[in-house]
Amino acid sequence: MKTQLFVAMAALSISCSSFAENIPNQTIADSKVLQPITGVRVSMQRMVKSNEGRYFMSLYAGINNPHAELYDLVENKTIKFKGTQKGDQLNLKSVSSEESTDTYQLSGVLNANTGLFKALLSDQKNTFGTSIQFEPAFKVANKPVFVFKFYGQNDATNPYGKTLQRIDVINKNNNTVAQTLTAFTGYPNSIGYMDINFDGYYDVLVSDVSNGRQVEDKRYIYWMYNPKTQQFQRSPQLEKIVGLPNLHGEKRQIDFGNGQIYQVENGLLNKISNE
């Protein structure tokens, strides 16, 4: 039987608040004129849990094809959903899997600012449904609400035709620029927005396409939100890891693929190996 061995990585076993460090931003004067980029998808992963503690869910909403993974911590099973969204209303249906062929429906109203999701879960045995109140899994007070504006350049030598080179972080409450992220060359079609270190604050993830890299290389640029400075800061430690971070908030684990699984525990990032 496999046992899990927690191996503290010298370069990575640091406080979660120290994942990031300040890296000077590139001044606009040092770069070419950048043009606004529209249609950039913000892939936001919301991690929510039910009030009674039975369910944990990773929810991707506000995109063309909203989807979710619902973990039933009592019955120890996972249900994947896909569906539609109109305004704040989500209507999701389960996707068949090897684990289960049962059909489930999950519908409800999502508050995009607070992360509260009032939902109704139904199946063949319970067509009336069970009311579930979801809330952020990692709650913090005064969490900022941001939106983004994107800028870049056309690049005929790049396989994507252009590159993302600047992100303006806009405070949604007063429509002011809270921060400008620069000094990078990124994939121009989408960014990730997720709580990578499970501290309750969302972080920014961009696919690095500098120096001939492509999306398939799975190299990423990380900006971790620091609530003390109220700024996003680059994380060279995370940027050394190859692989797309797959977050398992119910276990506080990050899976980068190829056996690279890290546990966030007591403010430390530890690598898990199986033997």
Stretches found by the model and what they are:
Residues 13-17:
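N-terminal signal peptide c-region/cleavage motif recognized by signal peptidases
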Residues 21-196, 201-275:
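Beta-propeller-forming repeat regions
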